[in-house]
Amino acid sequence: SVRDQYWAAKYKSWYDAGDAHEINMTMLENFLNMAEPATLQRMHGHYLASGFNTAEEVNGSGQQGPDALSIWWYNRNLRIFNNILRTKPGPEDRILVLFGNGHMPILRHCFYSSPEFRVVELKTLLKK
């Protein structure tokens, strides 16, 4: 659709600009940039803006985009979260989670929502 083409082009330009900028960053600077709420929101938005609600209809339902995103992508992230739970972390354990930025909005939601975890943002761990 025209909408999908528009957003695919927009996100490609954002990714290209980000790649050009990140090449001059240290790994730490890159991780800090990726952890910024605005970056996480923008990257998660790609899943919602491109091919999500304009996907071809299946059986006239018009729900192929949401179904694919929830069945495949949300499931994948819940499995990642579950694998972390399966390590049986204790109350004093610390866990560092490094995943691709596409996973982080959902994983952050899981960790912030779970009473078993207290999330500590990377930037708060750095010495000033």
Where would I find each of the regions flagged by the language model?
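A cross-kingdom marker for long, charged
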Residues: S70-K128
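Hydrophobic, often amphipathic alpha-helical segments used for membrane interaction and targeting
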Residues: S1-G90, C110
